[in-house]
């Protein structure tokens, strides 16, 4: 009697074949995440380039916004739909455009197209980092870190306008359009006095400081592996052994501050933690603004400033500035409201 030992070949289905093709070793890895990433990134970028080049915002904001109309890179934009569109997805085949591409562009359909494809493209890029990290068997902290800018994008471009009356109040996709949105945030929400914004600023600027300090310290403590060594010579950038002296760096900062990071793991975790936490906090703050939650309101100072013309603080001055932003910005920025402000209600300094 003969006994045959071996593994029975399982029948491979279409899913296995697709999985093999997606994960094949090639110059640009595709993967399952690529099914989401590449089309969405292509459409988001293509929609933005199309809008900034050819499409006017005259019907939504009363503005010229394309290169074709004379705008430059800083002033062109893909503008948000008008407030009358509310939160409509503005699908090309929807009841608003009814398949008319020109009408769809006039209504602001490119903005929802770019915003939604952009959001899913960013999510696809994060999933790509997860997928490749799993394939090469490393931890997924790159993907976790990238969740921070995704949180900011989604909160600013999607959640905030969803909390307001329509997509109109989201930022337009353009440099000057983003600046307009920042002024709007300050005037209508006093955003710079919001503690979540403060944490975001601390995270971003703190991360820049940490990055500069870390880079400088590594360059300062590179091992000299040959004659005439400097930052760019006498060591191999692909060498397997240690490139710089952590002990020397630790001694240096111990003398500077009295404390220093004791190991590279804690040092690099801190460099990851600071910016990611800051961006996540600012995203949470924007979610609060979507619900019109207030920041710090020092009402007692406002009451005293109203009663005493000689009493003024930097806070009361900022409140006046915010009132000015609202009064002068709203009439132009929200033409659909037909706002008209008589001279006597426009804000003036306490001493005037």
From Swiss-Prot:
It comes from the Eukaryota. GO terms for biological process: photosynthetic electron transport in photosystem II. It is found in: Plastid, Chloroplast thylakoid membrane. Keywords: Acetylation, Chlorophyll, Chloroplast, Chromophore, Electron transport, Iron, Magnesium, Membrane, Metal-binding, Oxidoreductase, Phosphoprotein, Photosynthesis, Photosystem II, Plastid, Thylakoid, Transmembrane, Transmembrane helix, Transport. Chlorophyll a ChlzD2 binds at residue 117. Pheophytin a binds at residues 129, 142. It catalyses: 2 a plastoquinone + 4 hnu + 2 H2O = 2 a plastoquinol + O2. Its main location: plastid. GO terms for molecular function: chlorophyll binding; electron transporter, transferring electrons within the cyclic electron transport pathway of photosynthesis activity; iron ion binding; oxygen evolving activity. Chlorophyll a PD2 binds at residue 197. The chain crosses the membrane at residues 40-60, 124-140, 152-165, 207-227, 278-294. Its EC number is 1.10.3.9. Fe cation binds at residues 214, 268. The D1/D2 heterodimer binds P680, chlorophylls that are the primary electron donor of PSII, and subsequent electron acceptors. It shares a non-heme iron and each subunit binds pheophytin, quinone, additional chlorophylls, carotenoids and lipids. There is also a Cl(-1) ion associated with D1 and D2, which is required for oxygen evolution. The PSII complex binds additional chlorophylls, carotenoids and specific lipids. It is an enzyme of class 1 (oxidoreductase). The modification N-acetylthreonine is found at residue 2. A plastoquinone binds at residues 214, 261. Belongs to the reaction center PufL/M/PsbA/D family. 2 of the reaction center chlorophylls (ChlD1 and ChlD2) are entirely coordinated by water. Photosystem II (PSII) is a light-driven water:plastoquinone oxidoreductase that uses light energy to abstract electrons from H(2)O, generating O(2) and a proton gradient subsequently used for ATP formation. It consists of a core antenna complex that captures photons, and an electron transfer chain that converts photonic excitation into a charge separation. The D1/D2 (PsbA/PsbD) reaction center heterodimer binds P680, the primary electron donor of PSII as well as several subsequent electron acceptors. D2 is needed for assembly of a stable PSII complex. PSII is composed of 1 copy each of membrane proteins PsbA, PsbB, PsbC, PsbD, PsbE, PsbF, PsbH, PsbI, PsbJ, PsbK, PsbL, PsbM, PsbT, PsbX, PsbY, PsbZ, Psb30/Ycf12, at least 3 peripheral proteins of the oxygen-evolving complex and a large number of cofactors. It forms dimeric complexes. This is Photosystem II D2 protein. The gene is psbD.
């Amino acid at each position: 009697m003969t006994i045959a030992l071996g593994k029975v070949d399982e029948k491979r289905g279409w899913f296995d074949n697709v999985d093999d093709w997606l994960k094949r070793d090639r110059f640009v890895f595709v993967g399952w995440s690529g099914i989401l990433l590449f089309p969405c990134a292509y459409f988001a970028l293509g929609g933005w380039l199309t809008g900034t080049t050819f499409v006017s915002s005259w019907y939504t904001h009363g503005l010229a916004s394309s290169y074709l109309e004379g705008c430059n890179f800083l002033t062109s934009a893909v503008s948000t739909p008008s407030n009358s569109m509310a939160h409509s997805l503005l699908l090309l085949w929807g009841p608003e455009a009814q398949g008319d591409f020109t009408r769809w562009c006039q209504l602001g359909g490119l903005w929802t197209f770019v915003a939604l494809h952009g959001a899913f493209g960013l999510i696809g890029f994060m999933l790509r980092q997860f997928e490749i990290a799993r394939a090469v068997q490393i931890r997924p902290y790159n993907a976790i870190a990238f969740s921070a800018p995704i949180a900011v994008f989604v909160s600013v471009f999607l959640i905030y306008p969803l909390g307001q009356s329509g997509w109109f109040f989201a930022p337009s996709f353009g440099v000057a359009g983003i600046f307009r949105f920042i002024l709007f945030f300050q005037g209508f929400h006093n955003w710079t006095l919001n503690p979540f914004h403060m944490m975001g600023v601390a995270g971003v600027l703190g991360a820049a400081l940490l990055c500069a300090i870390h880079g400088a310290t590594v360059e300062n403590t590179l091992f000299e592996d040959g004659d005439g060594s400097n930052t760019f010579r006498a060591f191999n950038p692909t060498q397997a052994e240690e490139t710089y002296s952590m002990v020397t760096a630790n001694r240096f900062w111990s003398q500077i501050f009295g404390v220093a990071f004791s190991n590279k793991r804690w040092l690099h975790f801190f460099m990851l933690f600071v910016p990611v936490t800051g961006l996540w906090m600012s995203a949470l703050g924007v979610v609060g603004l979507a619900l019109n939650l207030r920041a710090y309101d020092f009402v007692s100072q406002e009451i005293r400033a109203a009663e005493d013309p000689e009493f003024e603080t930097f806070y009361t001055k900022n409140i006046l500035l915010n009132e000015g932003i609202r009064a002068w910005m709203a009439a132009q920025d929200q033409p659909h409201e037909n706002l008209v402000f008589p001279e006597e209600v426009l804000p003036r300094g306490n001493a005037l």
